[in-house]
């Protein structure tokens, strides 16, 4: 210890109550006065929101499968609220919201509190607030009684301190009802919000209008080939169109093409202004050019970063023309994870024999990168030593560079103008 003590300003009582008080919206999500978690929210938007409230949303854990990060769920648990968010591994959108610590949060429905840390909800109170529903189901394995409504379910324990509860047969299958006296009502232990009739198999959800915030969201990117060369990319994306539906701006889908050699104004007229403009301040390949060429290179090229689209576009500084596209997968475990939305792409190689997709593993198309049947040799992209994510490996063929992690999944695909220097 160095004798220093970190002092953190505690939020006021009003601030504390406002952020722990959430409105429950079945089939939609949880909403507070300062932020919301809704079904269909992209993971990078959720991470950004958590980072914007570091004093309120604390004890955050991120869990994912290292072996299969694209098809197993990604989970974010916010310990200070007891909220657990399940993201579909492929789409990276919230598909299930759980609250499993009711002592940390206040829940309301129709502007009335039905559970708070000092008076957690009982089965009777839940039924009173949410009305009649079908008989509940009983999980024999976990001794849990589940009461469900469309897009919403509540779990109550059975057994242990509640051993005086009696489970009665229902109308078939695992349907059951609980018998209990007024002094031993089961307390709510978990609430789930989802799309569809079954929380264990939530239906897929599109990004809601409220999450667009004036940004484009990519549906698919494909390469445009002409005479054996990639000349640009075809982008299908969703964007708000100005029409208002149910108090939110409506969304339309557009398909546009961006070519190598397009100007800055061409790109802005298609995609709008970028989230950020980034100037390349260093060039790690300069060492391969020789020291005598150091003065031959002028001002750096610059990127248009479209984080929400999972897309970067590089412009030549002198001509202000497009020379490169970078498509990001937002792979868990990569140092850029959470910065970009996932870009869904499908890049066929020239012979159409191999396809590079967002969820591809390098082994699926590695033969296309072989030279005279020899295994491809990667360029190792080493990050700073203090960061925990490790190195990635880059492989290149004509106009395409793929970057992958040790588990073989892709982190990015770069498409560059064959007429320009890489």
UniProtKB/Swiss-Prot annotation:
May play a regulatory role in autophagic activity. This is PHAF1 protein T01G9.2. Pfam families: PHAF1 (PF03676). Its main location: cytoplasm. Keywords: Cytoplasm. Belongs to the PHAF1 family. One of its GO terms (cellular component) is striated muscle dense body. GO terms for biological process: Golgi to plasma membrane protein transport. It is found in: Cytoplasm; Preautophagosomal structure. It comes from the Eukaryota.
């Amino acid at each position: 210890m160095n004798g220093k003590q970190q002092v953190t300003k505690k939020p006021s009582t009003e601030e504390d109550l406002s952020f722990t008080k959430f409105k429950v919206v079945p089939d939609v999500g949880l909403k507070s006065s300062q932020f919301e978690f809704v079904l269909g929210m992209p993971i990078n938007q959720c991470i950004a929101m958590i980072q914007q409230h570091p004093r309120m949303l604390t004890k955050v854990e991120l869990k994912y499968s290292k072996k299969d990060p694209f098809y197993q769920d990604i989970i974010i648990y916010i310990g200070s609220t007891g909220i657990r968010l399940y993201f579909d591994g492929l789409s990276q959108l919230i598909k299930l919201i759980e609250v499993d610590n009711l002592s940390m949060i206040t829940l309301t429905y129709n502007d009335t509190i039905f559970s708070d840390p000092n008076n957690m909800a009982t089965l009777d109170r839940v039924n009173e607030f949410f009305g009649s529903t079908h008989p509940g189901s009983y999980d024999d394995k976990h001794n849990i009684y589940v009461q469900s409504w469309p897009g919403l379910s509540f779990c109550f324990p059975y057994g242990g301190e509640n051993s005086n509860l009696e489970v009665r047969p229902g109308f078939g299958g695992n349907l059951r009802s609980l018998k209990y006296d007024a002094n031993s009502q089961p307390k709510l232990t978990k609430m789930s919000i989802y799309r569809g009739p079954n929380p264990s198999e939530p239906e897929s959800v599109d990004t809601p209008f409220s999450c667009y915030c004036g940004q484009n969201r990519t549906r698919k990117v494909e390469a445009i080939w002409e005479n054996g060369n990639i000349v640009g990319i075809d982008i299908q994306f969703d964007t708000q169109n100005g029409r208002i539906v149910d108090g939110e701006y409506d969304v339309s889908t557009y398909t546009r093409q961006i070519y190598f050699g397009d100007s800055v104004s061409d790109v802005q007229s298609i995609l709008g202004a970028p989230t950020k403009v980034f100037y390349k301040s260093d060039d790690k390949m300069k060492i391969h050019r020789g020291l005598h060429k150091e003065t031959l290179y002028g001002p750096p090229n610059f990127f248009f970063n479209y984080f929400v689209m999972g897309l970067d576009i590089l412009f030549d500084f002198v001509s202000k023309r497009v020379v490169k596209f970078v498509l990001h997968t937002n792979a868990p475990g990569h140092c850029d994870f959470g910065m970009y939305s996932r870009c869904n792409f499908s890049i066929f190689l020239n012979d159409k024999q191999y396809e590079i997709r967002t969820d591809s593993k390098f082994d699926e198309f590695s033969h296309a990168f072989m030279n005279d049947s020899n295994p491809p040799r990667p360029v190792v992209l080493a990050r700073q030593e203090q960061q925990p994510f490790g190195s990635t490996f880059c492989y290149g063929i004509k106009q395409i560079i793929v970057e992958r992690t040790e588990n073989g999944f892709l982190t990015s695909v770069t498409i560059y103008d064959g007429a320009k220097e890489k």
